[in-house]
Amino acid sequence: MSVQGVKVSDIVAVNNLKHAWQFVLDMLDEPTDYSFVCKVNRCVGGNSLINRAGYLRNVPVRMVGTTWKPGMPIESQIKEEMAEIGQIENPTDRALTMMLYLVRKQMFLDGNKRTSMLAGNYVMIGGGCGIISVPIELQPVFMGLLIRFYESNDMTEIKQFLYENCIDGIEFTHLPEQEAEHGQENLRGWER
């Protein structure tokens, strides 16, 4: 079945993202390492959406909006740098650093932003820190900061932006004592 006016490749991309999220949520006890990120990209680019999905790119790539070009990815270097990032104690900082490292590294032929966002969210969810989600109205700002990050390799500004604007989760508020007692009374009624 197709959707009128939507390209098949777009439908495949959305379906692949769904499967990538399923994979990420099923793997919450696994380390965020090179192998994991390759598997995420394989999910993102599966069904022939991305050539060589899940494998390091072996050709140069260009980035839209900048003349900066990422170097060729080297597996041993990536493994070492990811292990260093994995040592960051604060899970939110670790997640944002991992996401930004991966998006700038451009390990794959395509799907690097989706893959890096999923890897960052994997760390966030595993640490109980919510999720990273760039609101649609902030996407132009995010893309501008991303280009500056590509060119400078300084993640300070974009990390602060993500931290302040792009982390969602449940906010637990402290209930006043009367409301808490009332809630306990309601629960006792169900025990009968």
Model-derived features: where do they sit?
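FIC/Doc superfamily catalytic core
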Residues: 1-192
